[in-house]
Amino acid sequence: MEKWTKENVLKILPVDDESAAMITSTALAVDSSEAAKDYWISLLGDSAETIEFISDFNQKRFHSTHSGNSPSIMKNKKNVTPNNNIRQKNTATSSHPSFYIANNKQKGYDEEMYKVNPASRNKSQSNNISSHEKSSKTTKNVSPGVMTSDLIPEKKSVKHNNSSSNRIEGLADIEKAIRQIEISQNINKAERRVCNCQGRKHPLNEAAPNCLNCGKIICIVEGIGPCTFCDNPVISKAQQLELIQELKHEGSRLKQAANQKRKSKTVSSKNNFQRLQNSSLHSIFLDPKQLEQKAQEAEERKNVLLNFDRTSAQRTRIIDEAADFDPTSLASDTWASPAEKALNLVRMQKAMAKKEKKKKKVLSISLSGKKVVVDQKEASSESSDEDQDELDNLTKVEGQSHSHNPKAPVIRNLPRPIYHQDLHSSHVAVPESILNKINQKWSKVQDDDGMPSML
């Protein structure tokens, strides 16, 4: 068997005796006929001669094994139940060709009908292979059902963009590639990283995808240095020099392109400058009437602004409606004048006092009449009169011009303190702590905001 296979391999392939012996030994080590067929087709191709050789090889190689197993099959047939015998008979009758059973009558057959010429046998084998492939395609299209494993979302396979890696986009990439080639020339084998992924884990090295001596597939991790398996250089020194020259040429081309872009930008900027310069020159040669009118308008605007700065009078009034609902924002108005700030501070204090009074209520409960009366002290009308006077004074101040120092406080509009002499009479017993505070001298200090404070 081995000798016959070796002779046929030498007829089909132009190889020596040793390689033919290796091919036959690997083919004889295959277990099934399908695996042997795939092996021979991948090695010899799918021509008519190879298909005939594959069929003869499978008959000689695997026919003896089936015939050796026939006694055990016959023993097992005796133990089969009658129902199984009936099924076997039905299948046996159905397995005969169409000319064997015709009109429910059994006919004899000649042995010559089963003798096939080698050319016709090759055609039939090729037809059988194509029909088998068609049937396998049809069976693949039929889905048996939904499995639990089908419900799991498939992982998206990461596709390496080889087109982007082939492009050289910048000078930094070119310098990096040249540096990598120079380093790979001087690196030792002990310092290199060995990777046996065969390009399945890492992308292939584009410069040298495999070793020409041993055929090892080289990935990016291993680089361009010598092969880690056979120690032979993957790229010769001449090829490395050619790569470096090509990379330098590409770098010079990119530099020229960058310089051209820079020159085009300068030309466009010069054109824009000339266009603006021409427009400015055109504006000079206007009608004298238009120039006089524009100069007069500018002079009037200048006089108005200078007058505003000289008088520094307040001509606008801001009505803050939000302050009616939030009294705490009255004193923090940055746009208010010092007089308005002082008045806002007094208003805020009064509003806070009113809010505190509303919280404190006195309830009078009459058990006899079964009534509850809320006793709340009403604010005196004097406070409203004082507020009205302060507002009138403020409107008068707003109509006048401000002083040169806008931070100076307007103290004349605030209520003055009143001294009650009855406290010092002998009829009233005043504590010593209060007397000390009354007799103490107060010093007036002005803070940064222009507000007076007593110390």
Swiss-Prot record:
Oligomer and partners: Component of the RQT (ribosome quality control trigger) complex.
GO cellular component: cytosol; nucleus; RQC-trigger complex
Phosphoserine: modified positions: S70, S380
Pfam families: zf-C2HC5 (PF06221)
Domain of life per record: Eukaryota
Organism: Schizosaccharomyces pombe (strain 972 / ATCC 24843) (Fission yeast)
Polar residues compositional bias, start-end: 65-98, 119-130
GO biological process, one term: positive regulation of DNA-templated transcription
Database matches in InterPro entries: TRIP4-like, TRIP4/RQT4_C2HC5_Znf
Name of the molecule in the record: RQC trigger complex subunit RQT4 homolog
Keywords for this protein: Cytoplasm, Phosphoprotein
Region (Disordered): 64-98, 118-148
UniProt function note: Probably functions as part of the RQC trigger (RQT) complex that activates the ribosome quality control (RQC) pathway, a pathway that degrades nascent peptide chains during problematic translation.
Main localization (coarse): cytoplasm
Any GO MF annotation of the entry: zinc ion binding
Location in or out of the cell: Cytoplasm, Cytosol
